Amino acid sequence: MPEDVLFVCKGPGMNIWDDDWGTQVEDWSGGGGLAKGLVPSGPQLGATLYELERGNFMVFHFHHGSEELLVVLRGRPTLRTLDGERQLDEGEAVHFPAGPAGAHEIRNDTDETVRYLVAGIRVSPEIVEYPDLKKATGQSKHGLFFIHDVEEDA
């Protein structure tokens, strides 16, 4: 193996068009929908595949340490940001910077299933804020995960 290769992915790949969801990530926020982490992923870069039926959503949130790239694979989800709402098209890609400016929600207001991929750098530890829920999560690559209530500004 060449010396400049730091990480070699071993094991099966994943087909983003496959309808077999296998093990799913639990949604604690109430938005519903399906999520699964993608294999392969590296020590720094990761991705998650999401699927939303009508009425499901990925709750409004932003990451303090990492930026994200969303690519719509199927359907026409509604994107909510600090600038308002708009419908995304299949194949459209949207970047969300780290911090409050990157706050976003993805929602399915249509009768068609929505599928999208979110990729980003894995920052550890990471804090994610959910302004509508007045909560924040803390997480690390070592298995730490907690949900914390965020108090109103005085």
Where are these regions (language model features)?
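Conserved short histidine dyad/triad with adjacent acidic residue
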Residues: 33, 48-63, 97, 101
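Short, conserved beta-strand element in jelly-roll/cupin
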Residues: 49-53, 62-81, 119-123
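Short acidic-glycine-tyrosine-enriched beta hairpin
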Residues: 82-99
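A short, N-terminal "cap"/entry segment at the start of jelly-roll beta-barrel domains
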Residues: 1-44, 127-154
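Ligand-binding loop in jelly-roll beta-barrel domains
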Residues: 98-126
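Short histidine-centered beta-strand/loop micro-motifs
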Residues: 37-39, 58-63, 105-108
